[in-house]
């Protein structure tokens, strides 16, 4: 039976992906696994905004995105991050194709809270047919975390949230949320498994804090909507913390 795996990687991952990452991708392909990659790019966006003397502001951990900001975000993601990742895969003999929200209405979204965050959105529709067509051609889609509203406005989307939405609509078997740590740590030890009840307890006790909270919430959202397992880890070669029901 064909397995579907979605991988979310950071924006600087093209320079950091290891031979083991590419070897794992190649092995999965020999097992008839369908793979899609969602990439971030926050650091590159911030760097480009600074170079263009645009203010950088975050509210509740969410980047405030003006119309100029969304244009810069598109430049960073589609002009720098995605091409670098595609080239890194090409050098390893892995056939990919870069996609964005404008690729045949790939990701349709709506504004999250325009008064507070500007052009930041959430995804409510994924063109799964397009992704399946690319899989039939043995291509790995590499997807930028951007959405477009029904009236054509581009939106900035958190990459974890984008990967979660794509995994949900594709009914993926596995979702890997790659981060800079090897899993969810409690008292210095990496949890092998995390359930919704345990996650709530750890958050209530303030053991899980900061940037790990939205990542875990994304993982919980995915498993509650049909994704079998979500891995919070620093590499696809290690399961990390498996978030499951």
Swiss-Prot record:
Substrate binds at residues 41-42, 63, 156. GO terms for molecular function: acetylglutamate kinase activity; ATP binding. Signal peptide: none annotated. Keywords: Amino-acid biosynthesis, Arginine biosynthesis, ATP-binding, Cytoplasm, Kinase, Nucleotide-binding, Transferase. GO terms for cellular component: cytoplasm. The record marks 8, 215 as: Transition state stabilizer. Pfam families: AA_kinase. Gene3D superfamilies: Acetylglutamate kinase-like (3.40.1160.10). It is found in: Cytoplasm. Its EC number is 2.7.2.8. PANTHER family: N-ACETYLGLUTAMATE SYNTHASE (PTHR23342), N-ACETYLGLUTAMATE SYNTHASE, MITOCHONDRIAL (PTHR23342:SF0). Belongs to the acetylglutamate kinase family. ArgB subfamily. NCBIfam families: argB. This is Acetylglutamate kinase. It comes from Leuconostoc citreum (strain KM20).
């Amino acid at each position: 039976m064909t397995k579907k795996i979605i991988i979310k990687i950071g924006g600087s991952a093209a320079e950091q992906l290891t031979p083991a990452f590419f070897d794992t991708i190649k092995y999965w392909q020999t097992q008839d696994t369908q793979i899609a990659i969602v990439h971030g790019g926050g650091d590159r966006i911030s760097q480009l905004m600074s170079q263009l003397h645009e203010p950088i502001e975050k509210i509740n951990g969410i980047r405030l995105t003006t119309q100029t900001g969304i244009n810069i975000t598109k430049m960073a993601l589609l002009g720098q991050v995605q091409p670098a990742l595609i080239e890194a895969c090409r050098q390893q003999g892995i056939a990919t194709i870069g996609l964005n929200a404008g690729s045949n209405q790939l990701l349709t979204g709506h504004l999250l809270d325009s008064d507070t965050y500007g052009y930041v959105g959430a995804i409510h529709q994924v063109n799964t047919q397009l992704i399946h067509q690319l899989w039939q051609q043995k291509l790995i889609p590499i997807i930028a975390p951007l959405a477009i509203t029904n009236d054509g406005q581009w939106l900035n989307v958190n990459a974890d949230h984008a990967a979660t939405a794509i995994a949900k609509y594709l009914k993926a078997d596995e979702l890997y949320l790659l981060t800079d740590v090897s899993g969810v740590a409690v008292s210095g030890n990496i949890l092998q498994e995390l359930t919704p009840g345990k996650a709530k307890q750890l958050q209530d006790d303030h053991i899980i804090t900061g940037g790990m909270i939205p990542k875990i919430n994304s993982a919980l959202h995915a498993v509650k909507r049909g994704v079998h397992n979500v891995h919070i880890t620093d590499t696809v070669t290690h399961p990390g913390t498996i978030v499951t029901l």
